Amino acid sequence: SSLEKNAYPEVNSLINSFYEAWGRKDIEQMKQLTDNLDAVDEAKVTNSTYIESYNDITVYTKPGLTDDSYVVYASYKLKFTDIKAEAPGLSQLYVMKNEDGSYIIHNDSSDEKINAYLQKVTQDEDVQKLVSQVEDDLNSAIESDEDLKAFEEQLGQDSNSSARAEEGATLTVQEDCNFRAEADTEAEILDVIPGGTEVTKVADGPEGWIEVEYNNEKGFVSQDLLR
């Protein structure tokens, strides 16, 4: 089924409230809107002091695995502190009803079934088109504003620090992540490393992967999840 735009008022309201709370760094409100907001999630929000607000939120949906559940693609304009131009962005979320019948964001990175479904839906042609459109919009915004360009470059350097780290360096896993036998998203999962865990860098893996040691075992973790 094709992407629907702002089709479900309750879902729109939930997503808007969630991103408004993120802009305010209102952890308590975010906890009420999700079924799980752990210490790593909290740190991610409170540490993102450079984010002032999420504006112009548009909610795109696809059916979830069950009735009354949805895969959500939220597009927005990100307002950074002291930067006038806004940066287009897109996030994927999973929304479902809780026991009392109200919609919440299902925020459990260890839910393999949902994770697999989210990956599958992202391959849909209309979703790929949306992702490309937002990427194009972001690139245009960056090219037309020097301040935004400089800021995004700085952010990119920060997130690539794990790739620049020396072998033997200690890195911290940013959120629960799969520890895989090979540098491939289809490879066997040896373990799930909890967010906040420190691991030792063994070597740079193929593009986008870092080989690390965890519990005396060597395996691969996505570079984006390490700092």
Regions found by a protein language model. Give the residues of each.
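Core segments of small alpha/beta cavity-forming domains
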Residues: 1-54, 116-166, 189
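Exposed beta-sheet edge and beta->alpha loop/turn motif
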Residues: 66-145, 194-198
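A structural signal for short, hydrophobic beta-strand segments that form beta-sheets
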Residues: 56-64, 170-173, 198-204
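Hydrophobic pocket/interface hotspot
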Residues: 18, 29-31, 72, 95, ...
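Short alpha-helix capping/helix-loop boundary micro-motifs
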Residues: 183-188
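Short solvent-exposed beta->alpha transition segments
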Residues: 27-76, 80-88
